[in-house]
């Protein structure tokens, strides 16, 4: 049953119905639509539109419908309804007859769907918050296990300075915490109830919208009916937050894919999150990480899609806004599975310490230490930088590490170099000197892990 029709004399085209109907997408709002309808029944009862008995009958029927659909979700799509609101109303009328036709009094699908969608965002958002917390915990646990595993740090994908794997893990903890902050902030802004805003001008019935908002666990009602029915900022913000978080997950995936290559060999991935080749028997591919990286693009696409849909819409509601859900649902599904998969990858990850240490000892990652040593002897840093650059060229030519030079050879670069240079060029010294807040010294990494565990 359509929720409109009296204005029309001709039949709706079958093609238009297929084009216009949103049930194949918005069926996911069923529970929110029923919950909102139960609250609305109380609201219209409070202003005398229905009696207390009628309200009780409506709520009983709606709760029965909720149980029935949870037992057999397929009945929604099998109904052929235009949208989830039409399905719920038709099913309600089938249960209670003409009483069901009273429920929509004072309500529009415009404020109804806006409320449903915010309720859905709140519910799914809470689950995403929990997933972010789980991933954060896995990163901290991995950082604690491997806090002192030495590996090369990179800039421009060139070996730069030694760091620890624990320090690397903590970098992504920082990113995940920012994702958590963005998501919780977005959910706070979405915690307002549009119900009672009508089609665009507000409902004609003097109900208590504050009570209605609280009944649906919103912090407060929205304050402008035009904005209430046309606002999709919560969709944009959730897609934006997901996009930033997926960017972080993709960067982490890229790092781990590289660390897992035969050329690097810093880590091994569990069989749980890898797959093989149909042709090459030796292959163990990091498919979980590659899919995280790949799904990031589709999340970005949905963000651009909703921004583009909304950018030129006049107030208030327009049918364009029906396109707000498919992308959002896909974003939330993609983000959720990627968060789960990232946590699973980390839980089974093993650091190959000898390989990672060997790589850190190569590539002249201690060159900065030699420059700092020269500075400690009184040489200006810019001059020291040049001297060490010359020394690196010479070391490359001789195929030796910097610490492979004899003292006499060192003195050809700068005669202020003494025997005490050698202790400064060890990996241990490189790490220990970064003993500053946020640094990679083992003392700092341990303190950071302790702080994260406490928080």
Swiss-Prot record:
It catalyses: 2-(N(omega)-L-arginino)succinate = fumarate + L-arginine. It comes from the Bacteria. Keywords: Amino-acid biosynthesis, Arginine biosynthesis, Cytoplasm, Lyase. Gene3D superfamilies: Fumarase/aspartase (C-terminal domain) (1.10.40.30), Fumarase/aspartase (Central domain) (1.20.200.10), Fumarase/aspartase (N-terminal domain) (1.10.275.10). GO terms for molecular function: argininosuccinate lyase activity. It is found in: Cytoplasm. GO terms for biological process: arginine biosynthetic process via ornithine; L-arginine biosynthetic process. GO terms for cellular component: cytosol. This is Argininosuccinate lyase.
